[in-house]
Amino acid sequence: MGLQARRWASGSRGAAGPRRGVLQLLPLPLPLPLLLLLLLRPGAGRAAAQGEAEAPTLYLWKTGPWGRCMGDECGPGGIQTRAVWCAHVEGWTTLHTNCKQAERPNNQQNCFKVCDWHKELYDWRLGPWNQCQPVISKSLEKPLECIKGEEGIQVREIACIQKDKDIPAEDIICEYFEPKPLLEQACLIPCQQDCIVSEFSAWSECSKTCGSGLQHRTRHVVAPPQFGGSGCPNLTEFQVCQSSPCEAEELRYSLHVGPWSTCSMPHSRQVRQARRRGKNKEREKDRSKGVKDPEARELIKKKRNRNRQNRQENKYWDIQIGYQTREVMCINKTGKAADLSFCQQEKLPMTFQSCVITKECQVSEWSEWSPCSKTCHDMVSPAGTRVRTRTIRQFPIGSEKECPEFEEKEPCLSQGDGVVPCATYGWRTTEWTECRVDPLLSQQDKRRGNQTALCGGGIQTREVYCVQANENLLSQLSTHKNKEASKPMDLKLCTGPIPNTTQLCHIPCPTECEVSPWSAWGPCTYENCNDQQGKKGFKLRKRRITNEPTGGSGVTGNCPHLLEAIPCEEPACYDWKAVRLGNCEPDNGKECGPGTQVQEVVCINSDGEEVDRQLCRDAIFPIPVACDAPCPKDCVLSTWSTWSSCSHTCSGKTTEGKQIRARSILAYAGEEGGIRCPNSSALQEVRSCNEHPCTVYHWQTGPWGQCIEDTSVSSFNTTTTWNGEASCSVGMQTRKVICVRVNVGQVGPKKCPESLRPETVRPCLLPCKKDCIVTPYSDWTSCPSSCKEGDSSIRKQSRHRVIIQLPANGGRDCTDPLYEEKACEAPQACQSYRWKTHKWRRCQLVPWSVQQDSPGAQEGCGPGRQARAITCRKQDGGQAGIHECLQYAGPVPALTQACQIPCQDDCQLTSWSKFSSCNGDCGAVRTRKRTLVGKSKKKEKCKNSHLYPLIETQYCPCDKYNAQPVGNWSDCILPEGKVEVLLGMKVQGDIKECGQGYRYQAMACYDQNGRLVETSRCNSHGYIEEACIIPCPSDCKLSEWSNWSRCSKSCGSGVKVRSKWLREKPYNGGRPCPKLDHVNQAQVYEVVPCHSDCNQYLWVTEPWSICKVTFVNMRENCGEGVQTRKVRCMQNTADGPSEHVEDYLCDPEEMPLGSRVCKLPCPEDCVISEWGPWTQCVLPCNQSSFRQRSADPIRQPADEGRSCPNAVEKEPCNLNKNCYHYDYNVTDWSTCQLSEKAVCGNGIKTRMLDCVRSDGKSVDLKYCEALGLEKNWQMNTSCMVECPVNCQLSDWSPWSECSQTCGLTGKMIRRRTVTQPFQGDGRPCPSLMDQSKPCPVKPCYRWQYGQWSPCQVQEAQCGEGTRTRNISCVVSDGSADDFSKVVDEEFCADIELIIDGNKNMVLEESCSQPCPGDCYLKDWSSWSLCQLTCVNGEDLGFGGIQVRSRPVIIQELENQHLCPEQMLETKSCYDGQCYEYKWMASAWKGSSRTVWCQRSDGINVTGGCLVMSQPDADRSCNPPCSQPHSYCSETKTCHCEEGYTEVMSSNSTLEQCTLIPVVVLPTMEDKRGDVKTSRAVHPTQPSSNPAGRGRTWFLQPFGPDGRLKTWVYGVAAGAFVLLIFIVSMIYLACKKPKKPQRRQNNRLKPLTLAYDGDADM
């Protein structure tokens, strides 16, 4: 009861609503009889009691999903939990007590905790996809024509497994790492493919030569039925054939031989052998008794030992010769047996023969596994191999089964604590070589010469070698001791990417020392003002370094001298300098007359700098200057001009420095009482200057010497840094300093200022010594391990080492050799093995007890079988194990052979003689002979030469050969240079890639029969050579740089340009031209900023001349006039204007006036001085500000004279007239400037500041500097010119093995790789990275089966027989279309006897010859082409299939019931094609044509095309078309010819063809009533309808009588009127009104040329 209640409760879980009891499930109210029936049922009471005792529950247990597995350790033992709660059946949660506690589910369970390392232990196992099953869909009907196939679904089994134990595991473990793979997938069930067969062959000949027979024709299967397609039709068709009546009686009986029985032994072998051994012992005793001679006994003993050894070898063979029998029957043409007497034959076939008892191959048990070949641990390829072997115990004899494998290998891992890691290998590199620039030079640059001081971007190389990576490698190269490095290994051991062997580098370019111009000569001063001893002084001039030199031998070692000195007398360190003269103060307080001018002075030092006045206390103070203040009516003179610049910098015998100053007359004196003006000579003064002699001295410094060790400093053995470079010690440098007189040479040192003498000694750094570091020698290369017969060349082995650090700074040189070689030890003589065959044993016949019942048998003679022993021998005859011969000695010789013990009636012949010698040319023959022996000479049957030929002939070998070239020419190949191992590292340069080479064409040699032979027979080395040229690349060639142009501005910052012109374009892969100028494609520009000193040239004016009055007052000599002065352009120097130059060099706008209007005061007038300079305008300029200049009154006017004018003159400040603003302007960047010795690399771009006036004119920078304007621009920036790195290639690899081992098409290939891609304007990589060369032609020899002979049944007409075939050695040229030609077997002597990959030669096999009247299967057809399953030419992925078939041949119709079934065999294939099948049809011949199905490759087939789309082959109409002018159409209905219309009957058949009438239409142009006739062409085109009726018009134009109806005429007239209206409207719409002609503006548009940038355009 309880169990039932629990079941009910569990069944109620999850119900949608509460279940109150069983009765609640019934519909209420129930009929009373039914209710009583329920209560009275057996068990009903129990159910009711149960419902009362245990009411259905309203509460159920609910569970959540299991949580994550938790645990301390991985694997089993984890715990996972889930939530459990009590819920009402309506879904809401309630207390746990409302549910039954006994039924509470577990909230905790054990689980498997998955960890990351479990990924290696567990994985999904994917089962194979099962067969594709169709998806059943009743709503979709299958189409009549299958296009692609039917959609299906296929499933597979998936399970999580533990990989090492191959046991299932929980899916959750595998799902932790990878989602569960798909269980099912969509698939395609292709369309059904019916069997497709070929066309029938031609009919065979009649089976009988007389009487009634059968002839047949067959076809073969092209494609088998697939995917449920229909089976194949009959492959054979028969028809009865009649020949001429038979004259004799038809042969009704045939002798039939059955198959041979299994080979068996005649008697118990042990009994027979025991009896034989007993007899042999007695025989040996008798022999030993009879032999007394000890030498004879020794010979017998050796023979016994040899026979015993042979027996030991023969234990592997155990050959037993038995016998087998067969049955011979006489059967009639219906296949029933008859008495042998019906088969009339002279000699019956033998029913017995000797045979070999079949023995299967027997092998021993497996040996123990060998140790693992890998004795170390390697993470990359951890597995090694281990081997176990077994030996042969019994060779197979007479069995087709081969022996199993004697060796088995499996992967293994070396395990245990003592396993060491395997050697790993990695690349190492040598030190980079010195940076070199010359490899980057173009051909043109290299030819230009000096390449010694190149700098800038360069290239450096290093070598790469392979070492064992897990040795203790050299960590750093920084000590003086011998450094150890790993020895180089074979490069093939390193597998990672090879490090770069080239890289770009940079050699700092030396910058030249740049100095400022010389300053002006200073005053005579002491060498040292702090030590003023003696009276010797020097006048000095100086210059400074404006750009420090870099990259030279010293910081200032390459600079010219910066100071020049001239000896002088009376030196002074300080002196007074007059600033200006004061006004002339008359003496004694008078207003005019003699007076003095006081000079305003400052104290200056020898450099011209103002200093404290106290320092000039020893100097002579300037005294006041005497002057005259003019009185009225006195002559008035101007003030003295400044002294001119000195005419010479020094004074000598022929030169003397002079300075001039002048003054002019401002006003003449009056006639009465005034002081007169002096004469003209008094208006000019000359004084000497630069009186020192022209002997200039300076200190001249030589270059700094080599840095030598300073023992006083370098005792500290430490590494220091000096200017950022590491050094091991401090050294000392010296240089020579001499005193030099300019233009003379060296003089004594006292002539030069000693205190200003440059240094002669300075400290320097001694760079660390670097010794040559070489790796240890590599291992010796291996000598040939296996011996080669006939290889007499001397083998050598070598070893090498690599320089990883070159010596530097006086380190130890590389003196030891880098390469050693020695001769290999002579290899041991090759040990070869051979089979030794022993004598054939006696011929063993079938026992007489077996053959005595056979008619014609004779005891002791007849056919038998004999065996022989074979042993394994070394080449020298020594004993060897049988396994050596099995491995090295080729196929096992035959162990048995058929033999014959001649009977009395048999023909006996001698053995064949040797072939006679060949005499004569090609075409001669040689013979061999044999003769009959004994009584055979007299027997007639033995004299039959067909059965027993006594002479054989064969053609002699012919030695006529001809050679002919084959194949294409090879690439042009340069001769390989000799590779020398140099001391030091390789320097990467240009590899020779051009010049004269050779190309090769293979030569083939053929004999007189057209068979390919070795090329040596034609006295050829295998090639035709032809010289060829690989054109050398020519780089782009530009001209030399032109001279720099003049600076574009004569004042301020401009640009200067130089250019190159294109001389020659690159060709043959030379360096391309740099990017050319966009305007002129043939020119390359280089633009740099330049600065022209605005004060370089200046206008110099002489004083104004005396004002020449134009209207002369004879009494006063005064009034208006003109005065002039000379204006010259002078070159400015530090000492002032020096030389007169052309006027165009000075600014014409700034040229001072050369003449002006003047006013000469009268004697009584006021005289004022020259106007002073204008004051500066206040910036910014505006009209409200003014500038002024002033003049001083010199002579006061007389009483009657004119008073003095205003001595101050003002003018407004106008912008760009007399007032200017100034601002900085920055030029564009120059092109990247490199050193003259650099090709590429780091350069510098410069720009310059320019001070620009507000009117746009460049002025001297001092104007902007005076205003303190900001200068925030960077004037220099670094730049990079990409280096033109030529493409660098590796050496050519060795020639590969020939792609073909023989034949005409073999090629050898060698490759090279890019080791350095080209960069910038470097020479690009050539496209030819592979070179091919034909291999020497070798004949292709192989073994080939001959054709099977017909089935031969010995001495019978039918039954079981044999067929045989031969193997022959054939030669071909390896091409597919070459027919193989048979040659002597000696050419295939070195080729393993394998045909089609099979070592077992099948030269004989049993066959069955059908008896007359038998029904039999024909031979297999050849395999069909591989055909894929495709749709619209697209493979569906089901693989290909091939098929072959065997048709049935019937010889007698009576035996059809005995015929076997035709056979079909298929196999899968992979290199198939998609084929399509289409219906083809010939042209109609009458009412019929031929229709057939054709495959896309042109084969006619049956069964490949869809039947429903087959075209008709017959188009005859029923009933026939008998009406005139009718014909039968392709739709098999009658139609009328052209020009006639059909008249149909009520049942839609053609009644008659009526001629279509002519419609007469009047023409529009002709009003005379001309008519045009028009006849409708096919007015009623036929149409096909379901009823098969011809097409008819809806409105019939013809009446029942065949005439046109009336409405047709009305329609024709209306159509004609409509046509006239349409034509008229078109004419009016298209007609254009006349317009006045406009004159066209034929201005030519500018022609735009699309310029492609080619300089040749």
Curated annotation (Swiss-Prot):
Q: Keyword Disulfide bond on this protein?
A: yes
Per the database entry, which stretches of residues form a coiled coil? 267-315
Q: Where is this region: Disordered?
A: 265-311, 1570-1591
Which superkingdom is the protein from? Eukaryota
Composition bias (Basic and acidic residues) maps to: 281-299
Q: Give ranges for the Cytoplasmic compartment.
A: 1629-1657
Respond yes or no to whether keyword DNA-binding is given for this record.
Answer: no
Q: Mind naming one GO cellular-component term on file for this protein? A: cell projection
Q: What parts of the sequence cross the membrane?
A: 1608-1628
What modifications does the entry list under PTM / processing?
Proteolytic cleavage in the extracellular region generates a 210 kDa soluble form.
Please give the biological process terms from Gene Ontology that the record holds. actin cytoskeleton organization; angiogenesis; cell differentiation
> Which residue intervals are topologically Extracellular?
48-1607
First and last residue of the signal peptide: 1-47
Q: Found in which tissues?
A: Detected on kidney podocytes along the glomerular capillary wall (at protein level).
Spell out the disulfide connections: 435-505, 455-509, 466-494, 635-677, 646-650, 689-694, 707-764, 728-768, 739-752, 772-814, 783-787, 824-830, 972-1028, 994-1032, 1005-1018, 1036-1073, 1047-1051, 1090-1094, 1213-1219, 1232-1279, 1240-1283, 1251-1264, 1287-1325, 1298-1302, 1335-1340, 1351-1407, 1358-1411, 1369-1388, 1415-1459, 1426-1430, 1469-1474
Ranges for the TSP type-1 domain? 57-116, 120-192, 194-247, 360-416, 423-510, 512-574, 634-695, 696-769, 771-831, 832-904, 906-959, 960-1033, 1035-1095, 1096-1163, 1166-1220, 1221-1284, 1286-1341, 1342-1412, 1414-1475
Keyword tags: Angiogenesis, Cell membrane, Cell projection, Coiled coil, Differentiation, Disulfide bond, Glycoprotein, Membrane, Repeat, Secreted, Signal, Transmembrane, Transmembrane helix
What PANTHER family does the record point to? SPONDIN (PTHR11311), THROMBOSPONDIN TYPE-1 DOMAIN-CONTAINING PROTEIN 7A (PTHR11311:SF8)
Domain free text? Sequence analysis combined with the expression of constructs corresponding each to two or three adjacent TSP type-1 domains suggests the presence of 21 TSP type-1 domains; not all of these are detected by standard bioinformatic tools.
* Medical condition linked: Autoantibodies against THSD7A have been detected in serum and glomeruli from patients with idiopathic membranous nephropathy. The majority of the autoantibodies react with the two most N-terminal TSP type-1 domains.
Protein's UniProt name: Thrombospondin type-1 domain-containing protein 7A
Q: Look up and give the organism this protein is from.
A: Homo sapiens
